[in-house]
């Protein structure tokens, strides 16, 4: 999966199309990412009381994971780009690059 935690992404499909956000968590086995401020849902949780007597629960708004095919990584210029790889000569490791301008992401 070419999208990682900490990347800034642009939503290219769905109800939040055009929104930018930071990837909070990646789920590579499910091919989904959790993006800050995108795909917000209302979750109903049971009201419970903790030991101090404070109540928690009710209707909570939170982000839900979105499929990676619906997002594009934003490169250093602030524009969406496809992600490629190249081999770093010094370290011998794979480095992610922007296919749009060839720079490192």
UniProtKB/Swiss-Prot annotation:
- Could you tell me which Gene3D superfamilies the record lists for this protein? 2.30.30.30
Gene Ontology annotations of biological process type: translation
SUPFAM superfamilies per record: Translation proteins SH3-like domain
The UniProt keyword set, sorted, is: Ribonucleoprotein, Ribosomal protein, RNA-binding, rRNA-binding
The terms under GO molecular function for this entry are: rRNA binding; structural constituent of ribosome
Q: Which InterPro entries match?
A: KOW, Rib_uL2_dom2, Ribosomal_uL24, Ribosomal_uL24_CS, Ribosomal_uL24_KOW, Translation_prot_SH3-like_sf
Show the Pfam families listed in the entry: KOW (PF00467), ribosomal_L24 (PF17136)
Q: Which GO terms describe its cellular component?
A: ribonucleoprotein complex; ribosome
SMART domains (alphabetical): KOW
Family, as annotated: Belongs to the universal ribosomal protein uL24 family.
Q: What does this protein do?
A: One of two assembly initiator proteins, it binds directly to the 5'-end of the 23S rRNA, where it nucleates assembly of the 50S subunit. One of the proteins that surrounds the polypeptide exit tunnel on the outside of the subunit.
User: Quaternary form?
Assistant: Part of the 50S ribosomal subunit.
Q: Which PANTHER family match?
A: MITOCHONDRIAL RIBOSOMAL PROTEIN L24
NCBIfam families reported in the protein's UniProt record: rplX_bact
Recorded protein name is Large ribosomal subunit protein uL24
